[in-house]
Curated annotation (Swiss-Prot):
NCBIfam families: NDP-sugDHase. This is UDP-glucose 6-dehydrogenase 1. GO terms for cellular component: nucleus. NAD(+) binds at residues 8-13, 33, 38, 86-90, 127-128, 162, 273-276, 343.
Length: 481
């Protein structure tokens, strides 16, 4: 029986291994993590991450050929193929701080693999890593491994979207495998390919050299984020000219050379990948003497920050240029619907901006806990040309935040409602009921364009929708960028 071990039981490692176990019942799959609490959650009925369809896949495979364990060294030592899906955050200090990927966890994983391996291993990069990381990992493994034990490094980046991860894994657009162009490297690529061909058509499995695979993941995320920043830049121009960004995006998306995906204007992109990977790409360009290319990609982040700042400014300016002492309901805190992931969510920066103007913020999200909200708002992060309101908040300021159990409670007695995540339930709320319980004039600031603005105006709301023509009230109170 082929044995697979995955280091890291997070948003990538857990779902990916669960689907491999589902589709390869004769392969033993073990997910390991140094966090005993996380492993306990994977072994319970309350999984540590929310992902549609994940519960069912885990339930069908767990205890059969899918296992979760904190006995890391044992299972790594027994495995034929070791996936490494550990965190690669942006460095917070030192050389490359604010841009470069921090490979501390990756290096620790490589040293541990070298120490415990008594047989040949195929080591698979699943985390998103900088170009040439495989070369560094090879050196660590070769210099620290036992005599006679061989290692082959593969790059097999994930192309998952949170909220649709199981669907993406079951029917991927493509599976990318990069390896050394040697006999041993090609054999390792084939071994991993044999796993995926159990359910993925062979024509969708792409093989490249290591460096192309590593860079392809960064490039894919950069291109997707670029599209979001492009349509968000257009949303600002639409508001200034009276155009409708939804109509513009639809017209542009009908061009077969462009396509319609990732053209929804919003308060900004978030998640664990886009900003981190673009900053990493910027750093790689700078290190390779390509400042013009670095500056090009840096603008994607700058537009994203601008969009969040613009949203906050619109809220404040619309409400008589102050939100001090006013209750603002925030509907949605996760970075997108159908996930509880709050990493780099635009809601953090919007909330900080409102609280910085002394607003009282009441937050509701169906999948985000109060503890998570408080942790996110208190967390420090590296300042990289960010506006002041994106800085860490003081404990005193965080006391201005409350978390509600539903949207109606969050909006009760509020002056304004900010919709920051496109949860389906926010489309069908009883907005007449919400309006009745709010201070007047009552505002809705739709950061995801999920509500019917005209229907809300008929109820009595003053409505701001990103990239849509402004009503008279908003025109009279222009937001300062």
């Amino acid at each position: 029986m082929v044995k697979i071990c995955c280091l890291g039981a997070g948003y990538v490692g857990g779902p990916t291994m669960a689907v491999i176990a589902l589709k390869c019942p004769d392969v033993e799959v073990v997910v390991v993590d140094i966090s005993a609490a996380r492993i306990d959650a994977w072994n319970s009925d309350a999984l540590p991450i929310y992902e549609p369809g994940l519960d069912d896949v885990v339930r069908r495979c767990r205890g059969r050929n899918l296992f979760f364990s904190s006995d890391v060294e044992r299972h790594v030592g027994e495995a034929d193929i070791v996936f490494v899906s550990v965190n690669t955050p942006t460095k917070a200090r030192g050389l490359g701080a604010g841009k470069a990927a921090d490979l501390t966890y990756w290096e620790s994983a490589a040293r541990m693999i070298a120490a415990v391996a008594t047989s040949d291993k195929v080591v698979v990069e699943k985390s998103t890593v900088p170009v040439k990381t495989a070369e560094a990992i090879e050196k660590i493994l070769d210099h620290n491994g036992r005599d006679g034990v061989g290692f082959q490094i593969l790059s097999n980046p994930e192309f998952l979207a949170e909220g649709t991860a199981i669907r993406d894994l079951l029917a991927p657009d493509r599976v990318l495998i990069g390896g050394r162009e040697t006999a041993a490297g090609r054999a390792a690529v084939q071994a991993l390919k044999d796993v995926y061909t159990r359910w993925v058509p062979e024509e969708r499995i792409l093989t490249t050299n290591l460096w192309s695979a590593e860079l392809s993941k960064l490039a894919a995320n950069a291109f997707l984020a670029q599209r979001i920043s492009s349509v968000n830049a257009m949303s600002a121009l639409c508001e200034a000219t009276g155009a409708d960004v939804a109509e513009v995006a639809y017209a542009v998306g009908k061009d077969s050379r462009i396509g319609a995906k990732f053209l929804n204007a919003s308060v900004g992109f978030g998640g664990s990948c886009f900003q981190k990977d673009i900053l990493n790409l910027v750093y790689i360009c700078e290190c390779n003497g390509l400042p013009e290319v670095a500056n090009y990609w840096k603008q994607v982040i700058k537009i994203n920050d601008y969009q969040k700042s613009r949203f906050v400014n619109r809220v404040v300016s619309s409400m008589f240029n102050t939100v001090a002492g006013k209750k603002i309901a925030v509907l949605g805190f996760a970075f997108k619907k159908d996930t509880g992931d709050t990493r780099e969510t635009p809601a953090i920066d919007v909330c900080k901006g409102l609280i910085g103007d002394k607003a009282k913020v009441s937050i509701y999200d169906p999948q985000v806990t109060e503890d998570q909200v408080q942790r996110d708002l208190a967390m420090s992060k590296f300042d990289w040309d960010h506006p002041v309101h994106l800085q860490p908040m003081s404990p005193t300021a965080i006391k201005q935040v409350s978390v509600a159990w539903d949207a109606y409670e969050a909006a009760r007695a509020a002056h304004g409602v900010c919709i920051l995540t496109e949860w389906d339930e926010f489309r069908s709320l009883d907005y007449a009921r919400i309006y009745g319980g709010m201070q007047k004039p009552a505002f809705v600031f739709d950061g995801r364009n999920v509500v019917d603005a005209e229907k809300l105006r008929e109820i009595g709301f003053i409505v701001y929708s990103i990239g849509k023509p402004l009503d008279a009230w908003l025109k009279d109170m222009p937001a300062v960028a």
